[in-house]
Amino acid sequence: MIREALWMVLYSGHILLHKQTIWRKDLMAWRRFWTSYRAYRRLAPPDKLPRLRTLTPCLGEDTAETSIEPIYFYQDAWAFEKIVQAMPPGHVDVGSQHKFVALLSKVVPVTMVDIRPLALPLNTLHFQQGSILDMPYEDDSLASVSSMCVVEHIGLGRYGDPLDWQGTEKAVAELKRILAPGGDLYLSVPMDDINRVYFNAHRAFSEQYFESLLYPFDIVERRYIHGNTFSDERGSGRCIGCYHARKPH
């Protein structure tokens, strides 16, 4: 427990420093907000002035560029294009980001499988509650399956799932089981030079190890997200790997 206690002290210090940085940024954002508010009051006629009770500060959104999270931006666009081009008779997604699944359902018949209930209904999207470790499908039954940035989380307890040190391996095996011969699988995972466990958050995998989990599937395409770049080159260090694999006949 001594090691764990020391880690908590170091981690708390890191969080405190981060919060101090955020606090300084917030202070500057508030200054800009009130400066802007006073300037607006000088511009608007009396009957068009904003009231204090309706002020809605949107701090930190006055950036020079549109803020984009690159992982979901690139991986979802990549998977969406691949699936729409293939135009399967039906597609099953397991645990991916809900915006990706909702948009895809407007083009392709989609069933969304997730361990937690879907809070909002959508007329083009069929929802099936279930676990990626025990999918409600027969062997060799599906033509097209996706699971974007999901399998690396399985077994770490982040989303209320049971702890399992082989969670990723079991999840990939289950996705392989339900795909029909010739079926397409779309996955994305964090990659690194060696396998790592960032406990409670996710795992990262070496390319060699992750592709061994996909065997004997054929790798149709590999793409990599390095920071703000989407590339065909693996390079070294951390990245997100996007995989299109196909089950052999």
Give names to the regions the model predicted.
Residues V110, L185, V220:
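Hydrophobic anchor at the start of a short beta-strand
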Residues L133-V145:
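A short acidic, Gly/Pro-enriched loop at the edge of an enzyme's catalytic core
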Residues S105, A180, Y215:
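Short conserved AdoMet
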Residues G157-Y159, D184-Y209:
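Conserved class I S-adenosyl-L-methionine
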Residues M1-Q85, P89-G90, Y198-P216, V220-N228, ...:
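N-terminal accessory regions of S-adenosyl-L-methionine
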Residues L163-D184:
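A short glycine-rich, Lys/Arg-flanked "PGG" loop and its adjoining helix->strand segment in the class I
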Residues S146, V151, G155:
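A conserved beta-strand element that flanks and buttresses the S-adenosyl-L-methionine
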Residues Q85, G90-M135:
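Class I SAM-dependent methyltransferase SAM/SAH-binding core
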